[in-house]
């Protein structure tokens, strides 16, 4: 008798269990089982600020029942709509889940959301639009990103950036390079330190005069940028608002006030791969100035008397940054000079020092295309100095001595455009040329040329406001 009751109880329990399975997962007679016509992706990758969009097609095996949707991202319910349309502002990796139910069957689908930084490799154009600074992001070769006209206002709605002055990449203490962007804007200027992956202003430092140039200091042990004004040089420690004047080093050297040119050029030691000093130029005295990086033995002025009476057109480092090239204009005669020099090695041990010397200083002929206002940039890993005249680009190999070009290497865009800046890829094989066309409502354009063939790779015309500076970012 006991065995009979145990048998009946076992049969009943089995039947009850089967009913639960039929209703929840298996889909027996009359149960409508849920499935997806196309499986969800295992991973959805998008850029920061983009909208995650998933539109599944849901199938039911035995008639259409009313469906309920529950979309979760990062363990939070974000939608109950049939399709997920969800903007994601923060980068990172998140778990996603879709829960579907029709009252008879429940299905759960999981996926991963990978949100990448929106602003990475590419060209950044600091420009003026409606009397305010904007920062345009132009993705470069092989970068699956979108062009942004202005990444400043959208990420900093409560900041009124003034007219643009300059900008520079730098780094934060203990972190990777190029993750801090310093922008100078306004007159008098403010220095804005931005987290360059999200373009959020994290520090603001007022300067009581107009900044004409911002450059990253070359000292690897000290994260700071240099702000150049007409008569002063300041250092700004990153992740701080500490602005320190560095001017007295140079006024003491030249015996009076200085008028800084808007250039800074580092040079490296012959035997090591880091900076030995940073060079500046004083237009008031015609002096090549130096800021010590490796040690304090670096003098404040190099090759005294060489540039007396000259103003700087532009300068840059060449020969893997071991030497320097300067183009200057002698104020009294209007003659342009190309000076190729070794800036010296200043060891802390006097017997190991190597004096600076001029390799050559040659007057540039009128046929060379040089002019006051020319943009001068150097391919640092090579021996080539590029300079501009209007929309034309010229190039001089420093090893060619007095054999200056008489025709342009190439011309950019239309005759109404004027080149305002040039930037190089890390290997110097690509040169990005920024122009302004005052006849256009959006004057700023960008062109990419191959420096091996001098051919145009691509162009993006009239994409931004009046460009002030262009920077290349490698990742």
PLM feature spans:
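Bacterial Sec-dependent N-terminal signal peptides
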Residues: 1-46, 103-117, 123
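An edge-strand/N-cap motif at the start of beta-rich repeat modules
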Residues: 112-141
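Acidic, serine/threonine- and glycine-rich low-complexity intrinsically disordered segments
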Residues: 192-391
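Blade-level signature of beta-propeller repeat domains, shared across WD40, Kelch, NHL, RCC1
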Residues: 434-475
